[in-house]
């Protein structure tokens, strides 16, 4: 890159690389700060998987960064079960779409994005921050840059631990994502992987802080037996195909998303550096990619005489994204709180509510289309292939 960068992106994760590619497509010069890649241990493979909606898929496909079919399994149906007889079913055919979402293998997606960045002449990968008109902080929820800027990260800690692993099921998953809410507030999600007729699953089991150590200490067979019971034999038995990972759950939002450095230049937050939500709705990465898309859009549509770090642009980005993140955060928080209450009348009410919601086709369709990113969030790429429409 002969000329100095206009934008410095701190953090080369999925959101950071996506933003770099979006800006590069608009001929914006980008410096992408990346740490030296770590080699995963063969004994402890990366078990992360994300549910990506149609808007996120369209965005990544426009950047030629969508993984192969084997690493992006379509979800044709989603079944959500309450702690009694409550049940909600979403079906792709009813929504007239190919899939409700895709369960994507994180290492495969990261590899696709890294390859796209390597072939982008507008993006220079650097090992330390450089001066630019705009610095975008995409360092994740533990961002050191955000902390150094004095930005308050308002955290609500849930009394839950997420346990993640890869599984092999006794029966094919059929492209169905299944989720159970228990009377104790636990949320069990079994996400299909390995193709539409595969048996591989991504497990995300959000359990109470006191129960998590017990489950993690179990031998593999005993853990799978508990899992089989919690999933009501929906897929028969399970075999662990990876180590188990665990982390505490939280919802958080930064009190400021944009500002200026004392020495000059603007900064803005994106992705988990700006916000996190409970994983029960599977929307965390979709929100981060929508951040990247919106920031790229306001930069693309700016008046020719405005800098990429213009305060008006960054306020426009923050207003748009805060509203979307707040709505999703409140929705996931409300669901978590609703099922965390063990009061019997409330249990009957929430299960009755699930049944009523399942019968309300208009409301269910509206919720489904929002979750797919078809009602708000990420815009589709423009017909010219430049930017977002």
Task: Place the predicted regions along the sequence by residue.
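C-terminal helical "tail/cap" subdomain of flavin- and related membrane-associated enzymes
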Residues: 297-389
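Conserved N-terminal helical subregion
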Residues: 2-3, 58-62, 71-148, 154-164
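Glycine-rich FAD pyrophosphate-binding loop
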Residues: 10, 24-47
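N-terminal glycine-rich dinucleotide-binding loop that anchors FAD/FMN and/or NAD(P) in oxidoreductases
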Residues: 46-70
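Conserved FAD-binding catalytic core of PHBH/FMO-like flavoproteins
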Residues: 60, 134-246, 253, 258
